[in-house]
Amino acid sequence: MVDYQTLSIVFTGLSISIAAFYYINTLRNAQKAKRYENIKWFLERRSTTEDMLNFAWVQNQEWEDYKDHLRKYGMKENPEAWARLWSYLIMFDDIGLMVRRGLMDIEDFYDISQRSIPSVWKKYQPIIEEHRKRGEPTSMIDFEYLINEMHSVSKRRGDNLLADLG
């Protein structure tokens, strides 16, 4: 025969298990919602005329070497160009941080950006690396992380979409 105390222990344990399951499920749903919001933010930003113009401007910059880049687009020499460039690059560094922390899904990001973001990285990688050597060793590390993750997705899928981008 089952006594009252045993039933009480069983129901307490069952209640705690149900509460834990509910809490974990709620956390998972909140994380999915946050990932969706972050992708939505990127899509909304990317589809603006201003962002398209920034992308074209960033991709059309030309320079011979790091010193020439500084002369044309450096913070002291050309603050407007510097701000425009680095605000654009920082956006991808921030996205890389979100991917690293699980706040944005790399598969989703890869599907919506594919070659455009890695092409920016390829163009500016020498500038970023020189910037790191000159005193900013962590400059754009999350942008680099994002690119590495995108390459992993490309290899995993076997699409070789990014093969020519290094």
Model-derived segments and their meaning:
Residues 15-17, 57, 76, 103, ...:
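Generic detection of intrinsically disordered/low-complexity segments and helix-coil linkers/edges
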Residues 32-34, 40, 67, 72, ...:
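Context-gated lysine
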Residues 4, 22-23, 36, 66, ...:
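Sequence-level detector for tyrosine residue identity
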Residues 3-6, 77, 81:
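Juxtamembrane loop-transmembrane helix junctions in multi-pass integral membrane proteins
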Residues 9, 71-77, 88, 103:
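Generic signal for short, ordered secondary-structure residues
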